Amino acid sequence: MLRYSVIFLIIAIIAAVFGFGGIAAGAAEIAKILFYLFLVIFLVSLVLGMIRR
């Protein structure tokens, strides 16, 4: 249990550094691009899976 607390503390510190450091805007743009990219890949694989059945 203590191990998970330490892990979550480290994740929170890293998130705070990104959030308050100004890196968040760049990371958000990259996340948006990746989201749409993976959404397209998911839809293509879904359609191809339905066609092959």
Curated annotation (Swiss-Prot):
GO cellular component labels: plasma membrane
Alphabetical keyword list: Cell membrane, Membrane, Transmembrane, Transmembrane helix
Membrane association type: Multi-pass membrane protein
Cellular localization per UniProt: Cell membrane
Pfam families from the UniProt entry: DUF1328
Parts of the chain that traverse the membrane: 6-26, 30-50
Cited InterPro entries: DUF1328 (IPR009760)
Highest taxon above the source species: Bacteria
Disulfide bonds: none
HAMAP family xrefs: UPF0391
Assigned protein family: Belongs to the UPF0391 family.
This protein's name: UPF0391 membrane protein azo1750
Upper classification of the organism: Bacteria, Pseudomonadati, Pseudomonadota, Betaproteobacteria, Rhodocyclales
